[in-house]
Design a protein with these regions (language model features):
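N-terminal glycine-/charge-rich "phosphate-binding" loop or analogous flexible N-terminal tail
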Residues: 1-46
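Phosphate-coordination loops involved in phosphoryl transfer and adenosine-cofactor binding
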Residues: 2, 86, 137-140
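Short gly/ser/thr-rich secondary-structure transition/capping motifs
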Residues: 28-35, 48-52, 121-129
Length: 164
């Protein structure tokens, strides 16, 4: 009998199904299932769970849980709400994700910093009115959280002259 690993998530049905399929293909010798599909006996046998934006309370029904593998970068809520030190909570660190997110933060910051919505409006109205230019060094950008994603975004903003 294959070991059972619940996939505990708070995703829309389409995304949950896609993740479930990918996980099952990647681990053919493991039965990936919803936590709601497990019997009381099976719940007691679970030592590993895979999660994606879960409600941490959903994991509390697994009395022998030892390892939680998060497919998402952020695990703060899990750490805050699961106080059992015997459970290892492991998160995904993807350097490419950090770079991609930092590029998006930089792009949107420049979009707003250089007042692109106003210029697009002028373009639609066939107008050209020069706007005041504010230097990046005069603009402060706040980042909520300096984990891997936030730190990379902050570094890119600093490299481009913004105060962070």
């Amino acid at each position: 009998m294959n070991p059972i690993v619940p996939f505990v998530q708070n995703l829309n049905e389409k995304d949950a199904s896609a993740w479930h399929e990918v996980l099952q293909i990647a681990m053919p010798n493991v039965k990936i299932c919803k936590i709601s599909d497990l019997s009381k006996h099976e719940l007691k046998s679970i030592s590993v769970a895979i999660v994606a934006n879960p409600n941490p309370a959903d994991l509390l029904c697994l009395p022998n849980l030892k390892w939680v593998q998060s497919l998402w970068a952020g695990v703060e809520r899990l750490l805050d709400e699961i106080s059992n030190e015997e459970i290892s909570i492991v998160r995904l660190i993807d350097p490419q994700l950090s770079k991609t997110m930092a590029e998006a933060v930089l792009a949107w910051t420049f979009y707003l910093h250089r007042n692109m919505p106003e210029y697009a409006k002028q373009q639609n109205n066939k107008e050209w009115l020069q706007r005041d230019v504010i230097l990046a060094s005069k603009r402060t950008v706040g980042i909520l959280g300096l984990g891997h994603l936030g730190a990379e975004a902050a570094r890119r903003l600093l490299d481009n002259g913004f105060k962070v």
